[in-house]
A protein has these predicted regions:
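N-terminal, active-site-proximal structural segment of metallo-dependent hydrolase catalytic domains
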Residues: 1-47, 51, 57, 62, ...
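Structured beta-strand-rich core segments of catalytic domains in phosphoester-bond hydrolases
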Residues: 37, 42-109
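Conserved beta strand-loop-helix elements of the APE1-like EEP
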Residues: 60-75, 193, 204-225
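Active-site beta-strand termini and strand-to-loop segments that position acidic
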Residues: 70, 94-97, 220-221, 239, ...
Length: 250
């Protein structure tokens, strides 16, 4: 089973940069996107052979998640069941017979870390949600998790210690999630590879490859041995992120 996850930084904008061609070329069984920045029906994209599921933020033009699936899930859940966290279209869960697929766009702590305190409460609530699912069947988490976990996951570690996405607090929450029974699939398959999934539009970061690895596939430990590939598609353009891939034998 091949899965793709991609923060498209606005689906309507990405569609003008060959998203449809990239979607077809990647040929995923489940294709998840984050930061759709739209309400249902606002994008002219209906790939043949797929069923679409979307979850939009209440605030128009902001956040949002979506999935396209070759095989329809048993059930679809929006949000994590916590009122304070379920207004921004951030978590879309698909239940299949043998696993849950959780598509997530984690809140950014923002410039000046204005939203770091909220981010910490989100992290705890989201981890609890994943553990509730994991108690029933294995979990595959994908998405833009807005954290570079370790120094190998970011080009300029020293100068970003207080930047949103690389604070000690955010990194510790990722460590806590993995310690709760989950595996970062790219790092498991490529323990020493330096590869990034996001580049700021500022400071000529793409030209310098001054990137961050903040897009993930994370799986329950008990299915980690089923992973056969975990890749980052740096050759695919259209957003400030690139797609990430998981192939798993489930």
């Amino acid at each position: 089973m091949k899965l793709i996850s991609w923060n498209v930084n606005g689906l309507r904008a990405c569609l003008t940069h060959d998203f449809a061609a990239s979607f077809a070329a990647l040929d995923a069984d489940i294709f998840s996107v984050q930061e759709t920045k739209m309400q249902p029906g606002q994008a002219d994209f209906a790939p043949e052979g797929y069923t679409e599921y979307t979850y939009s933020a209440e605030k128009k033009g902001y956040s949002g998640t979506a999935c396209w699936c070759k095989t329809a899930p048993l059930a679809v859940t929006t949000g994590i069941g916590r009122e304070e966290h379920d207004h921004e279209g951030r978590v879309l869960t698909l239940e299949y017979p043998g696993f849950y697929l959780v598509n997530c766009y984690t809140p950014n702590s923002q410039d000046g870390l204005k939203r770091l305190d909220y981010r910490m409460t989100w992290e705890d609530a989201f981890r609890a949600y994943l553990l509730e699912l994991d108690a029933k069947k294995p979990v595959i988490l994908c998405g833009d998790l807005n954290v570079a976990h370790t120094e190998i996951d970011i080009k300029n570690a020293k100068t970003n210690r207080m930047s949103a996405g690389f604070t000690d607090q955010e990194r510790a929450k990722m460590t806590e999630l993995l310690a709760a029974g989950f595996t970062d699939t790219f790092r498991a398959v490529h323990p020493d590879e330096v590869k990034y999934s996001w580049w700021s539009y500022r400071f000529h970061a793409p030209e310098k490859n001054a990137g961050w690895r903040i897009d993930y596939f994370i799986v329950s430990n008990r299915i980690a041995d089923k992973v056969t590939a975990a890749e980052i598609h740096n050759e695919v353009f259209g957003s400030d992120h690139c797609p990430v891939e998981l192939v798993i034998d489930l």
